[in-house]
């Protein structure tokens, strides 16, 4: 299995938003929900309208860990959710399948949605459902959130695991190698 990457470039994130919004509002909201909450796709897909309606946070038992978690709903995400669920019934899945009346879309459908959008906007990196979670973590870190806090949000065993997961280890390695200069060390010849 190939490792998937976060979407590091903000322009590409906005391109994904624009593309998905033009294709299908459900898919747009799925993308937004993922990059604004950092939830695993398995947890996003099991959400129902009642889980987010008039709420400031999502309370759930994580599918992978079995632990109870509370995830705040970001202020930029709230109006997107309000518009999306307007007129919908509380018991409906948030991201319901068009083929099955009372089922959510599958993980495979979510993967396909993200990959079609990524290719359409020119993203060359490996993209998958974990890309949403990794993008959330990467940009939270870029905006000053500590690895310690992200470790807790992601329920990781260490900050090193979190750094590797959100892709900042590779960024640091790349910057370090690009910054290497024997001339700047003062002893090299020009």
Language model segments and positions:
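Conserved catalytic core of the tyrosine transesterase superfamily
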Residues: 1-190
